[in-house]
Amino acid sequence: MTRVGLRIDVDTWRGTRDGVPALLKVLAEFDIQASFFFSVGPDNMGRHLWRLLRPRFLWKMLRSNAASLYGWDILLAGTAWPGRHIGARFGSLIRQTHDAGHEVGLHSWDHHGWQANVARWSDAQLAAQFHEGMDALTQILPSPVRCSAVAGWRADARVVEMKQRWNLDYNSDCRGTQPFRPRLKNGGLGTTQIPVTLPTYDEVIGERVSDGEFNDFILDAIEQDRGVPVYTIHAEVEGGAKLALFRQLLLLARQRHIEFCPLSSLLPDDSTTLPVGRIERAPFPGREGWLGVQTEE
């Protein structure tokens, strides 16, 4: 049996309202627990539209047929009107996710704000954004928040340092190959990172694979993964237009003896056995701009 961490990012108002219930239903059907990471502040995702001026982002939107994949309400959210606050409206749904046995962590306060501004925010602004999200999610959940995964994998050494004061069980802030302990600037070791190892739907569709090829492509990649496989889906995609495709993935995975689990299940009993590394900014296939990427020490 191959075990794979299943991470579900919830970025938007509609992804929370429509995508999460749909995913909860299909996961219950297959008796799967996963790790959900919620954005809990304003939905300003439509403000990414200015990035269409960048050829790499424009090509990503075109090859993934973004208008059909996400819907115009997501693509325009927070542009002509103030972004609606996700956690304030859907707290009961977030609690329902927790009560269904899934792991729930923080994705962001303002998903667009983090992706667009994290590189230029001051240390105080960075900490304030994370604190606001943690405070909002803490008020929603019946138990303390124990994990987080920053928006768009926009993380570096400064983000790692900022999160230390929260003493979380783990973070999932970067792309890489296996869980590791990040080296801190004082020479110590930080909170365990569990990187995402596999490509997401929007990173490869229309360029490397078609819809009809996608599930076999991902399952083959899981079986060939020589690290600790972690797969990310999005409530807006696999909980929306690609729900049937995702359900078929779960069915095929069962046939191939691939088992999905929450990311915390991938943590070793003794974190001192993990390798040491760092998170550095780097370009990444299928993405515009930089992402946090695991590097060896």
From Swiss-Prot:
Q: Which reaction does it catalyse?
A: 4-deoxy-4-formamido-alpha-L-arabinopyranosyl di-trans,octa-cis-undecaprenyl phosphate + H2O = 4-amino-4-deoxy-alpha-L-arabinopyranosyl di-trans,octa-cis-undecaprenyl phosphate + formate
| NodB homology domain residues | 2-261
Under InterPro entries, the record lists: ArnD (IPR023557), Glyco_hydro/deAcase_b/a-brl (IPR011330), NODB_dom (IPR002509), Polysacc_deacetylase_ArnD (IPR050248)
Q: Which Gene3D superfamilies does this entry report, sorted A to Z?
A: Glycoside hydrolase/deacetylase
The record's listing under SUPFAM superfamilies reads: Glycoside hydrolase/deacetylase
Q: What is its EC number?
A: 3.5.1.n3
Q: Name one GO biological process term.
A: lipopolysaccharide biosynthetic process
Any Pfam family from its record, for instance, is: Polysacc_deac_1
Q: Which UniProt keywords apply?
A: Antibiotic resistance, Hydrolase, Lipid A biosynthesis, Lipid biosynthesis, Lipid metabolism, Lipopolysaccharide biosynthesis
Named in its record, the pathway it takes part in is:
Glycolipid biosynthesis; 4-amino-4-deoxy-alpha-L-arabinose undecaprenyl phosphate biosynthesis; 4-amino-4-deoxy-alpha-L-arabinose undecaprenyl phosphate from UDP-4-deoxy-4-formamido-beta-L-arabinose and undecaprenyl phosphate: step 2/2; Bacterial outer membrane biogenesis; lipopolysaccharide biosynthesis
User: Broadest EC class?
Assistant: hydrolase
A Gene Ontology cellular-component term: membrane
- Keyword hit for Lipid biosynthesis: yes
Give the PROSITE patterns listed for this entry. Answer: NODB (PS51677)
* GO MF entries: hydrolase activity, acting on carbon-nitrogen (but not peptide) bonds, in linear amides
Stated role: Catalyzes the deformylation of 4-deoxy-4-formamido-L-arabinose-phosphoundecaprenol to 4-amino-4-deoxy-L-arabinose-phosphoundecaprenol. The modified arabinose is attached to lipid A and is required for resistance to polymyxin and cationic antimicrobial peptides.
The family database entries (NCBIfam families) matched by this protein are listed as: PRK15394.1 (NF011923)
Give the record's family classification.
Belongs to the polysaccharide deacetylase family. ArnD deformylase subfamily.
Q: Under which name does UniProt file this protein?
A: Probable 4-deoxy-4-formamido-L-arabinose-phosphoundecaprenol deformylase ArnD
Q: Which organism is it from?
A: Pectobacterium atrosepticum (strain SCRI 1043 / ATCC BAA-672) (Erwinia carotovora subsp. atroseptica)
